[in-house]
């Protein structure tokens, strides 16, 4: 059987990619794909233990990776973290959470926690990444 090359069809060498929620699931897949294409990947996550494990694994695999601990539901802290890690060329917003309970059993605090991450956090993180790219005169991708 012919072995297919793993070389990406494009290069992101020299690009900086921020992946929010990149310690598991789709976010981790995106982080690895960006790193395979040559990007320096910065992963933002709220759980330091998971973040440290992922960054260590990526660096062991030969990728350039950094981690920053921030909670996307804390809008001001998240914005400050994004401004700290500039410049950015690529932003992947993959943070998300779910509460697994029937709608009739969901209380307002549970609902608000999900919306703070999945809606408010996603919106304001994207806006902060766009502002960082504008401030640095970079044309990026969100």
Predicted features along the sequence, with ranges:
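Substrate-binding pocket helix/loop in short-chain dehydrogenase/reductase
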Residues: 102-103, 107-112
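Active-site loop of short-chain dehydrogenase/reductase
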Residues: 15, 63-64, 87-88, 133-142
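A short, exposed helix-loop element centered on a Lys and neighboring polar residues
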Residues: 126-127
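Conserved glycine-rich cofactor-binding loop
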Residues: 16, 23-25
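The beta1-alpha1 cofactor-binding region of Rossmann-like NAD(H)/NADP(H)-dependent oxidoreductases
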Residues: 49, 69-80, 108
């Amino acid at each position: 059987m012919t072995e297919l090359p793993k070389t990406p069809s494009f290069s992101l060498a020299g690009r900086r990619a921020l992946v929010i929620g990149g310690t598991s699931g789709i976010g981790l897949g995106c982080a690895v794909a960006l790193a395979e294409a040559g990007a320096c990947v910065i992963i933002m996550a709220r759980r330091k233990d998971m973040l440290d494990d992922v960054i260590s694994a990526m660096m062991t695999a030969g990728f350039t990776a950094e981690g920053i601990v921030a909670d996307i539901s804390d809008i001001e802290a998240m914005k400050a973290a994004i401004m700290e890690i500039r410049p950015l060329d690529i932003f992947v917003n993959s943070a998300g959470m779910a509460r697994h309970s029937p709608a009739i059993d969901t209380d307002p605090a549970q609902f608000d926690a999900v919306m703070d991450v999945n809606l408010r956090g996603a919106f304001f993180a994207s806006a902060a990444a766009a502002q960082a790219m504008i401030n640095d005169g970079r044309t990026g991708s969100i």
